[in-house]
């Protein structure tokens, strides 16, 4: 294979994404080894040190094959938002490039990926009292009155907001009253992301993907998922009803361990909810016309690198495939 030029900050960054259980880890490790790359994980749960089995975190042997970022770096006591992730990931990417290596973004957390590639509006925090007051007004005045106010103070945002989506109306008014500026101002002045990306979505036949999901859930349980959840439940100060513990693969075991559902129902729910999550991920990825789709079983690291080469040099031709 023709070697790539030395990495540069102006180069698009190869991103490998796809639904859960599609097989991103194996092919991304091969690509990282061939590219002399460091893997920048884009996963909203693998970043927590306490969550391993239920997040399908790369094993120690897999992590030794290439440097990994955002794997087990934070405690459950340290919330991590998509915006915070994007800022931290941009810093890591700069550091990787300064070391003369390529960053390779890998993962399927859709909002985190969007924040990294396209940015998020930098909206200041708003006092909870503002939202409380708006909710009281919702009760006394009704949603129509709040939407009419939004039309007056932020007509651009009102035009893009369904008046029946009450919480979105309240959020827009909350920003206006809390910051003195309309929500549309923050969206319109959103900073441009510092890097460009070329993204490959790995996909599989639906039934085969669902089979892989079911089998992976079984492996997680065999590997001790319930013990992991018990340990997490014993940590002082951890909120069991908030992310990441309210997410799939943790909330169902928590319900089981609390006695709310039996074991078989827990297994059924984890599998069903994970399949539904994979479907939502695929729907999200189809929003982006610039993404390249590939069939996971046939895709090798060389195929992914070929996509990167095409992005680096538009005159470099390669057959485009589709696995949507």
Curated annotation (Swiss-Prot):
It comes from the Bacteria. Pfam families: IPPT. One of its GO terms (biological process) is tRNA modification. The keyword tRNA processing applies. Residues 43-46 are annotated as: Interaction with substrate tRNA. Its EC number is 2.5.1.75. GO terms for molecular function: ATP binding; tRNA dimethylallyltransferase activity. Substrate binds at residues 20-25. It is an enzyme of class 2 (transferase). ATP binds at residues 18-25. The keyword Translocase does not apply. The record marks 131 as: Interaction with substrate tRNA. Its cofactor is Mg(2+). Keywords: ATP-binding, Magnesium, Nucleotide-binding, Transferase, tRNA processing. It catalyses: adenosine(37) in tRNA + dimethylallyl diphosphate = N(6)-dimethylallyladenosine(37) in tRNA + diphosphate. Disulfide bonds: none annotated. Coiled coil: none annotated. Monomer. Catalyzes the transfer of a dimethylallyl group onto the adenine at position 37 in tRNAs that read codons beginning with uridine, leading to the formation of N6-(dimethylallyl)adenosine (i(6)A). Belongs to the IPP transferase family. This is tRNA dimethylallyltransferase. The gene is miaA.
